[in-house]
């Protein structure tokens, strides 16, 4: 029996990564922390779903930018060695016109840098991130710039990146 991978799920939504990983093997994957916050909502429905479905996880319902580095240090001390997340896609999505596309500079696109901040502090062995395929081409005025910036940010931290299309 191998070591359990301890997980921090960022931009957790209703827990898709948690369900997928734990369904594949509860002996291998254990989520310790999750973060879900909906800034424009009076109610935090996705967060409430997480509390109900996953009562043994520490749920953090605040803007990820407001999570102090000390919390990430705690996660590191508690053995978190994997970060997963589907960071907000609105600034890349086809639901937004290409003319109004802001990509990594948009209100939600900048949240990518919070993944980098958490990674810098926690230093996980692995990261699994997902986003819409339009991210690869954003912004339309400089196709692929944002994805290249993201790859460079992970490279600077010593991570190699694998890009896989979903099926």
What would you call each of these model-derived segments?
Residues 1-167:
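Conserved active-site and SAM-binding loop architecture
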